[in-house]
Swiss-Prot record:
HAMAP family: MntP_pump. Pfam families: Mntp (PF02659). Belongs to the MntP (TC 9.B.29) family. PANTHER family: MANGANESE EFFLUX PUMP MNTP-RELATED. One of its GO terms (cellular component) is plasma membrane. The keyword Transferase does not apply. This is Putative manganese efflux pump MntP. Keywords: Cell inner membrane, Cell membrane, Ion transport, Manganese, Membrane, Transmembrane, Transmembrane helix, Transport. The chain crosses the membrane at residues 5-25, 41-61, 64-84, 105-125, 127-147, 169-189.
Length: 190
């Protein structure tokens, strides 16, 4: 695969991770370097691992990936998005009781949801007879960088007084929006 095409593919695959990272930065408002690195590392790792897994799965599972990947991604994003919205309306103080999306189950679910498209890319690269190692490394590194930038952008956006109060609502709505976008792109809505 040529370098410009590989970079374009990596950026395209990282767009969901970037949007989730911005939403996470908005939600947390004060983001430590550790939280940024943890989210970026996991998103990048999953984004690199999924095409490798897809490549090894090859043609045998393509019909399953094509049929169910969008539903899996939607379910994970909708679950976390609705959880964020619920927490936004339950707590008067935005910081009170807020779970950190850069830890635990939420982190793993977000990592899977934002990288599941890369699984299908791996299957496709396998069917084309292309090597997976360089594409997987580039995809993971691009995702890591865009995720780190996205978290910081979200933090800056949340610092503005107009957005600060509604950052968690915005974050949940963004996750739901990405989930519905995935369903729309897969043809669920016709």
């Amino acid at each position: 695969m040529e370098t410009p095409a590989l970079l374009a593919l990596a950026v395209a695959l990282a767009m969901d991770a970037l949007a989730v990272a911005v939403a996470t930065g908005c939600r947390l408002r004060t983001v430590s370097a550790r939280q940024t690195l943890r989210l970026a590392w996991h998103f990048g790792l999953f984004q690199a691992a999924m095409p490798i897994a897809g490549w090894f799965m090859g043609q045998g599972i393509r019909s399953f990936v094509d049929a169910w990947a969008h539903w899996i991604a939607f379910g994970l994003l909708a679950f976390i998005g609705l959880k964020m919205l619920k927490e936004a309306f339950e707590h008067d103080d935005a910081e009170c009781g807020m779970a950190d999306p850069t830890r635990g189950t939420s982190l793993i679910m977000l990592s899977v949801a934002t990288s599941i498209d890369a699984l299908a890319v791996g299957v496709t690269l396998s069917m084309l007879g292309l090597s997976i190692w360089m594409p997987a490394a580039v995809i993971g590194l691009v995702c890591l960088g865009l995720t780190a930038a996205g978290v910081q952008l979200g933090r800056v956006l949340a610092a503005s007084s107009a957005l600060s109060r509604y950052a968690e609502i915005l974050g949940g709505a963004v996750l739901l929006g990405i989930g519905f976008k995935i369903l729309h792109e897969s043809g669920v809505f016709g």
